[in-house]
């Protein structure tokens, strides 16, 4: 689209240039769509740097799960989520750490947003390899009739990680690898 703006926001003090260098190498024609503002989801005043009333806006909450509630409340109370036809919120898993916390977060979402404003996602399912499973299963006329319980006796899923917990230690301390990888990623791939 011609009128697209992707704004990174963080409590960390960055300039647009320092933020772009932190992201890595991207083509200039992509980078001109990027901007950066420093703000704090816990401080409504600092959120005012985010607002653009003329645009359809999606807020991707790339924050620790325990901050989702406060982020939603402050974005709503600052007036950013008032137009359900033009504002969205993306919440990445985990959506709570157990049934009680998931129900609580759902009550917050229901109180401050309309359901059509909310996207709950798992970034892992967007990976090329995972998407290729479906393409291979349903898009290959040779394999499609054979890919069923009559011809497949066993399914093995290997999740090999090349990265450690770098930058994710706090998340893993609260979520744990079983919650992060097994119950979300691996079971969704299996299904």
Predicted segments, located by residue:
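Secretory/organelle targeting and membrane-embedding segments
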Residues: 1-90, 95-191
């Amino acid at each position: 689209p011609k009128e697209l703006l992707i704004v990174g926001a963080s409590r960390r003090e960055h300039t647009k240039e320092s933020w772009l260098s932190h992201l890595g190498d991207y083509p200039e024609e992509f980078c001109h769509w990027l901007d950066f503002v420093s703000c704090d989801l816990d401080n409504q005043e600092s959120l005012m740097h985010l607002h653009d009333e003329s645009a359809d806006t999606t807020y991707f909450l790339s924050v620790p799960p325990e901050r989702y509630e406060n982020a939603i409340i402050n974005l709503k109370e600052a007036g950013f989520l008032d137009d359900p036809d033009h504002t969205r919120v993306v919440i990445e898993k985990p959506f709570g750490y157990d049934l009680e916390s998931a129900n609580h977060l759902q009550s917050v979402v229901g109180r401050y947003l309309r359901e059509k404003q909310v996207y709950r996602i798992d970034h892992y399912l967007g990976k090329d390899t995972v998407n290729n499973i479906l393409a291979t299963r349903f898009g290959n006329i040779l394999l499609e009739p054979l890919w069923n319980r009559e011809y497949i006796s066993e399914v093995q899923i290997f999740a090999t990680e090349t990265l450690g917990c770098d930058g994710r230690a706090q998340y893993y301390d609260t979520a744990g690898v079983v919650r992060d990888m097994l119950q979300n990623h691996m079971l969704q791939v299996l299904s």
